[in-house]
Amino acid sequence: MSSTILTQFGPFIESISGIIDQSNDIFEEAAKAFSAFTRSDVYKALDEIPFHDHATVHIPPTIYSKPSHDSYYYVDALNRVRRRTYQGDDDVYVPNCSIVELLEPHETLTSYGRLSSAIEARAKEGDPQARIATTYARISESQARQIKAPLEKFVLALLVAESGDALYDPILQKYDDVADLTHNCPLWCFREICRHVSGPLPDRAPYLYLSAGVFWLMSPRMTSAIPPLLSDLVNLAILQQTAGLDPSLVKMGVQVCLQAAASASYAWYVLKTKSVFPQNTLHSMYETLEGGFCPNLAWLEPRSDYKFMYMGATPLSGKYARTAPSNETRARQLGEKYGLSTIIGDLRQRTRQFTKHDFASVRYIRDAMACTSGIFLVRTPTETVLQEYTQSPEIKVPIPQKDWTGPIGEIRVLKDTTSSIARYLYRTWYLAAARMASQPRTWDPLFQAIMRSQYVTARGGSGAALRESLYAINVSLPDFKGLPVKAATKIFQAAQLANLPFSHTSVAILADTSMGLRNQVQRRPRSIMPLNVPQQQVSAPHTLTADYINYHMNLSTTSGSAVIEKVIPLGVYASSPPNQSINIDISACDASITWDFFLSVIMAAIHEGVASSSIGKPFMGVPASIVNDESVVGVRAARPISGMQNMVQHLSKLYKRGFSYRVNDSFSPGNDFTHMTTTFPSGSTATSTEHTANNSTMMETFLNVWGPEHTNDPDVLRLMRSLTIQRNYVCQGDDGLMIIDGTTAGKVSSETIQKMLELISAYGEEFGWKYDIAYDGTAEYLKLYFIFGCRIPNLSRHPIVGKERANSSAEEPWPAILDQVMGIFFNGVHDGLQWQRWIRYCSSLCCAFSRQRTMIGEEVRYLQYPMWSFVYWGLPPVKLFGSDPWIFSWYMPTGDLGMYSWISLIRPLMTRWMVANGYVSERCSSIFGNADYRRCFNDIRLYQGYYMARLPRNPKKSGRAAPRETREQFTQALSDYLMQNPELKSRVLRGRSEWEKYGAGIIHNPPSLFDVPHKWYQGAQEAATATREELSDMDDTLLRSRRHTYSSFSKLLEAYLRVRWRMCEAREPSVDLRLPLCAGIDPLNSDPFLKMVSVGPMLQSTRKYFAQTLFMAKTVSGLDVNAIDSALLRLRTLGADKKALTAQLLMVGLQESEADALAGKIMLQDVNTVQLARVVNLAVPDTWMSLDFDSMFKHHVNLLPKDGRHLNTDIPPRMGWLRAILRFLGAGVAMTATGVAVNVYLEDIDGGGRSLGQRFMTWMRQEGRSA
């Protein structure tokens, strides 16, 4: 596909397609062309594509003619602008309406306009019609802003990447067969819609996304649905090319998006129809099954460690066909309701054709699921609050009043005689609270400081309402005038409250909470309730008790939101027959945990549970107190309570009253109100852990008590007896997965499971929970999907162009967007897109974003990152220095390890290329022979790209001048907050004096709790908005770095380059080659597939794995456990006295006996490779997390040369730690080469092992001097 407009990109296109060598000159020429390309040029290039007829689709004309917004809004009795609901209670999203009548033209871009200032002015004065118009215009603009950058940039990068020839795969030795852009239906659609909207106007872009906001094309055909529609079309267009999606499925996805734009509300339609693709593919597969293989995993004991073992492959046969009830009726009804009957019919027919579980069938499911809309859904904050925070659960069997004792302060205790199922909830929480409070660790000053510090962050926390509540009782707070920090942070709050007694700060526990918003993909937007510091403080007993339950009493997982942090093998195990899984979710979980049932029982259980262990003790700065005890009717006594119980009393008062939610809706002028709600706050430290503990406790009560009491079916009873929450029910928050282990007899019958599920639903209704249960032969947990042991990446949940922009703050200044661009690349790696196409597209995208116009002083400059910066950040090159194309894998690490790895693969080629191009040196270097590599690397800007990539991409704000006295007051206040317990301070002082004796001079700036107040202060500074000067300083630093001439890489990378490897035999496959383990990672996607089968999949929880590689699992916020760990390891490596390690541990707050014992253990213990490598900042790359990197380090990197020992490769006896570093270097080289990960053998260490070790030791001693 050739285009006359794109000819200037010719050499760049050839270089990213592997035809010619990549070079920085070609890259920068292309970057200039990208930045010179106007929006109209992009549309002209689209005009040149001769699309095939089958890439076209009927575009409903109704998407261009939409009614006015007037009839969709009204002002309610409380004077709030509200959305009229026509299609259902939740029809409160942006209506698809015309917008041109509300716009005034832009001064210079006359074809574009934004909301008329006259309307905004009338809205401020309270005019109802103007308020309605402003609300509609602003929320439509917000919907259009949910993108990372203008869509044209992503389209242009696609046009450039796809202008190259078909890609040749050197591993499969064939050209790939993904159809070119002439078959791309979403791209055709994008072009036609833009063409139609712009009509006769000279400008073609339907809207402009600029830093000043969104500007709409002044066209009568422009509607609020066009931006989200275009955003979805661009996502689909890119995915079709880079993931090799089936064009006929993508066309169905396009039709659904067009229907959404033709409907009354795009986001609402998307939300209602998001199940179309998964329901008719993933959840309907294999009604007939005639073959295939699934993995056979064993879950090792204890199950809570989440370790699995691969036992081979299980052949699949008809007996494992889908037996779960059919969803056909539901699917057909959905199709009829939303006009999608044809699509659903076609999908179901195609799904039935797959009767074998293999690479093709799982790729089909993945392709179909990728076609779901991937926009971030928005609605006004007013509607979000009134949707999410007005539900109250219907409790069918409430706890009878007579089952409670009289009040003890704010709580009542549940009597032993109660017959309510609440007694089991009470018992679990009581037991956990008693055990938690009896642990000495709970009372340790460091542990309390960690708890007090965990919510001291640069995020907001309803500070204004807190200050108002304290002013109301005449408590004045220091205002730290003139301090250049962001006041709306919990760091600032902690400093203000540090020296106030609890009797004052406790007033703020009942203060209003402010409002945060989160927009999500394929889920309703959520409002966040950021609690203030005193509210978080009294939540601690709730958090600690829930943590105890989750750690000791159930099978919960903790994970972040990234795919790599979740326990993937759990889903593989759960979905592999004969095991079966049931996905159990609690609908509206926050709203279902209220004082009426849960919180009243839990608060009483904690209050009574901690009583015996906490007598008279304060906790986390909350003193002991006295309450009225009227638990025995007619008797009133004063009862002393401990600090922990005092917290529970205050928390109970808050939970009982509910939260007062202050809504200030920036999208709707005049929508400013306070809303009382009993819904559990989503911003509490207790939220997730609390829900998890309740989720498992209620399930345990069902399996052991309620279930058996409500059925006499012997099969159901036998099934319930075989299940426990310690072995079969995994949960996190409101998400649960019930795993029914396969027996020697095979699967449990579908009817038996159905009967149990009906019981669970009925059980939940008793206490107000609505269990949302899916039993369909697949496993879904934490938004990961599995079928027959194969993960199905949901590509639509990682939108390429979309970005959550929940508030109206301006977008982040360049070059911060480069982190997002690299994030797009890594998402694609985790999701298993077609590796060559994805690298090519991302190379094009990175080039498009690599250049920026800026003002430095009075002159215009262009800032340009060389291509090497992107290589340093992890984007693998395609072809360099005369190498073959496509020899670098996307598993190449980032940073120094990645640079070392690719250079190691082609070092002889680089030397030859440099010499051939005239870079010859008089002196021979051990690394590049007789090549004058320093001159070469400066000429090709390799050094400059390397050093620019290491510079910060956000302006530095912590250097601002501040009045010295105020700054010292502020850091002193933070220090008082942290060191509230004098014992903690004396430990750190003791550590410091010991350090002077035994540690001084060994390493610089050892981590200490005394650093934390200053780090918090810096954090509060960094949260502020950057000034123009700070932006200019950052640009200036980048420019200077680009102009500088360098003589070497960093000391670490120079040391790494002394090590050479020999790549040898391929290893045996770790898994059966016929097993689909991740849809899309299959023989058609050569490199990821060969890595997966040669290295093997990760078979344990990565989080648990890394937790075991730390000496200290937790520390106060502001210190980093990895930094403490590497300081301790460096001390050990540098031969420090054990007393220096003890001093270091005292400085981070451990008590002396504990510090001494841990120091002794560190001195003697055999330390894991991953942990030891931290001494030189090496860490496992994210892209390896789904692979078994641990066994690769242990078994496939050989430190004994293939032909026997050499003097140069021997490692001195006292430098055993070098082995860990060498294993990382070897693994980096093996993973960076495409194809099977081979066994690597150490070949040579230039200068020998001792000299290398000494280089690292010198580096360790110097590290931290500059900090």
From Swiss-Prot:
Q: Which GO terms describe its cellular component?
A: viral nucleocapsid
Catalytic reaction list: RNA(n) + a ribonucleoside 5'-triphosphate = RNA(n+1) + diphosphate
Quote the subcellular location field of this record: Virion
Q: Which UniProt keywords apply?
A: Capsid protein, Nucleotide-binding, Nucleotidyltransferase, RNA-directed RNA polymerase, Transferase, Viral RNA replication, Virion
Where's the RdRp catalytic domain? 555-792
Question: Please, which domain of life does this record's source organism belong to?
Answer: Viruses
The main location class comes to virion
| Molecular function GO labels | nucleotide binding; RNA binding; RNA-directed RNA polymerase activity
Job description of the protein: RNA-directed RNA polymerase that is involved in transcription and genome replication. Following infection, it catalyzes the synthesis of fully conservative plus strands. After core assembly, which consists in recruitment of one capped plus-strand for each genomic segments and polymerase complexes, the polymerase switches mode and catalyzes the synthesis of complementary minus-strands.
Q: What is this protein called?
A: RNA-directed RNA polymerase lambda-3
